[in-house]
Amino acid sequence: MGRNLKLKKESDFEFTKNHKRLLLGSVFLMATSAIGPAFLTQTAVFTSQFFVSFAFAILLSIIIDIGAQINIWRILVVTGLRGQEISNKVVPGLGTVISILIAFGGLAFNIGNIAGAGLGLNAIFGLDVKWGAAITAIFAILIFVSKSGQKIMDVVSMILGIVMILVVAYVMFVSNPPYGDAFVHTFAPEHPMKLVLPIITLVGGTVGGYITFAGAHRILDSGIKGKQYLPFVNQSAIAGILTTGIMRTLLFLAVLGVVVTGVTLSSENPPASVFEHAIGPIGKNIFGIVLFAAAMSSVIGSAYTSATFLKTLHKSLNERSNLIVIVFIVISTMIFLFIGKPISLLIIAGAINGWILPITLGAILIASKKKSIVGDYKHPNWMFIFGIVAVLVTILTGIFSFKEVLQLF
């Protein structure tokens, strides 16, 4: 496919059908990787706590997310290097360490994603959770057994993303939230300082750790690199964040429509109780569809992105990306089936994940000013400043996640 996307002249850019398919694939891979089981729970819990004012946190987090995403995607495509390769050029060995940490974090998170998919199938069909997890793993593995695994991954990510958006949009419509009030508080929240933690949490969950590299590495794997592709990269990066933002906004409004009536969400499963209160007993089954789609897409995104970091560790791994993905999914599934969800491991992985983005984005911002890495490309100053803000916000994310680790001991 990479050959099909080469341009006749490097100075020109023509948006073709192949570019459109790849744009949608990279956008939905990044967006659906971010929309996992934790995304659903976070949005429901914060909405029930802050009501209409949570709209402000969503808006600000989207702006910061774009700052992080557009910096990373542009520099990666200009240089043709992955995140870990650029990090190694800035600080020798840094990229290797990051790759290992991302692999550890991705494996731990995939245990949670596999479990979430099992719970989703349980809610839809009444299947045993472990059987549901095993079926999810088999389905994910079948995608990557094919030589066209990455193309199939693009299509599956798009389908799962569209299903989630349509289902949540329906629940939002039924719950009938106060749209006008939410719009006003998007720009004029009550007690804005209380929204600092939600904003930091949302940014960490949307572009933290491996997630922001999912789409960019997918683009590189398709053979796209060079300054001539920057218009395409800008569209992809912003569209990815906006897609995640749309899903979060729809879910926020759906939850808002329920909690403003005085309903208290279930502490065990807040998002599921939203669906049940909005559309009745069938809400549990409908939520299962959303949970399965969110978890399944995150299984694919996490395993694929972790593989793109690991395959540069040694030449022998470079042509075995699909095999790495399959091994990744098998190991995480086996751990869940025979051990369960190791909570302490997930907390530690979350803390590590919280530090990956500020370190890697920091290295990429440094690289953007080095001619030895980016050549004659001039990175816009406003983007650089945007990136610095994203680094500072994600450092705060890392501090909060590290505190959770300290509570384990």
Segments the model singles out, each with a brief description of its role:
Residues 1-40, 195-199, 225-228, 239:
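Membrane-interface "cap" regions at the ends of multi-pass membrane proteins
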Residues 12-20, 51, 77-107, 123-127, ...:
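Transmembrane-helix boundary/entry motifs in multi-pass membrane transporters
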Residues 45-70, 87-88, 93-94, 197, ...:
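Extracellular loop-to-transmembrane helix junctions
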Residues 95-126, 133-135, 292-312, 342-348, ...:
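Hydrophobic transmembrane alpha-helices that form the core helical bundles
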Residues 117, 131, 136, 146-175, ...:
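Membrane-interface loop-to-helix entry segments
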Residues 161-190, 199-217, 363-373, 397-409:
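Hydrophobic alpha-helical segments and their helix-loop junctions in multi-pass secondary transporters
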